[in-house]
Design a protein with these regions (language model features):
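N-terminal Rossmann NAD(P)H-binding glycine-rich loop of SDR-like oxidoreductase domains
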Residues: 3-23
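Conserved beta-strand positions in the Rossmann-like core of class I SAM-dependent methyltransferases
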Residues: 4, 28, 159
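Conserved SDR Rossmann-fold cofactor-binding beta-strand/turn motif
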Residues: 31, 113, 162-165
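NAD(P)H-binding glycine-rich loop region in Rossmannoid oxidoreductase-like domains
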Residues: 35-92, 96, 100-103, 201
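Active-site-lining helix/loop region of Rossmann-like oxidoreductase modules
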Residues: 79, 139-141, 150, 167-221
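Conserved Rossmann-fold NAD(P)-dependent oxidoreductase catalytic core, especially the SDR/UDP-sugar
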Residues: 81, 95-139, 153
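Conserved beta-loop-beta element that borders a ligand/cofactor-binding pocket
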Residues: 148-169
């Protein structure tokens, strides 16, 4: 499988890059011009901004699917930390994908979203609900909701992955669809990456367009 990957230098994207390579897939990574990135062997790197339609089209040429692991960045972990990205970054990325992918002959995209986005807020406990709307976290969540709406209005074969609280650590193989997101719900980034690779590789179109992804032993906090 040939996969175009955006956000390959990020926390999730770097794990997906590893998964793709280890499973023998061909990867084209679209990387910002100023980003420090030493590509692993057999990874094709194209330098360009994610909002540059020309760069995106070049990266998508000849691909079978797209893995989108971009997201709004903040200066710190606090909800009110300053934004380092445009407040509508993912909305604009989605619009570009909807425009560019059909012309490149690519239908499938698996995009990183977040637990608590859109209607999944009803699956969240009180603290998570508060955090999802607080400060610039709320800005990012509203942007992701609009990203999903843009994809939903398209004819793409798309899936938005909504992980619960992300943690580091080696893969456990326990990532899967959950129906609640509580204070103590966690999922490892490496497990999310492995699950997303499985989604990218599915032989049939997606039936569900969103999935709340957690650890299958996660409880309700």
């Amino acid at each position: 499988m040939k996969v175009a990957l955006t956000g390959a230098t990020g926390f999730i994207g770097s794990h997906i890059l590893t998964e793709l390579r280890e499973h023998g897939h061909e990867v084209t990574a679209l990387v910002r011009p100023g980003a420090t990135f030493v590509p692993p062997p057999n990874v094709r790197v194209m330098r360009g901004e994610p909002l540059d339609a020309t760069a995106l089209a070049a990266a998508l040429n000849g691909q079978d699917a797209v893995g989108c692991c971009l997201g709004i960045r903040r200066a710190g972990k606090a909800p009110w930390s300053a934004l380092l990205s445009p407040p509508d970054l993912m909305t604009r990325v989605a619009r570009l994908l909807v425009s560019v992918m059909p012309r490149a002959g690519v239908r499938r995209v698996v995009a990183m979203s977040a637990g608590g986005v859109a209607e999944s807020i009803t699956q969240c406990g009180g603290v998570i609900r508060w955090m999802a709307g607080a400060g610039n976290v709320g800005v990012a969540y509203r942007d992701l909701a609009e990203m999903e709406r843009q994809l939903s209005a398209s004819r793409l074969d798309w899936l938005a992955v909504r992980p619960v609280t992300l943690m580091n650590g080696p893969p456990t193989g326990l990532a899967g669809k959950v129906d609640r997101y509580g204070l103590f719900s966690i999922v490892r980034r490496s497990d999310v990456a492995a699950w997303m690779l499985g989604a990218l590789s599915r032989p049939t179109p997606f039936v569900e367009q969103t999935v709340l992804l957690g650890t299958l032993t996660t409880g309700w906090g």
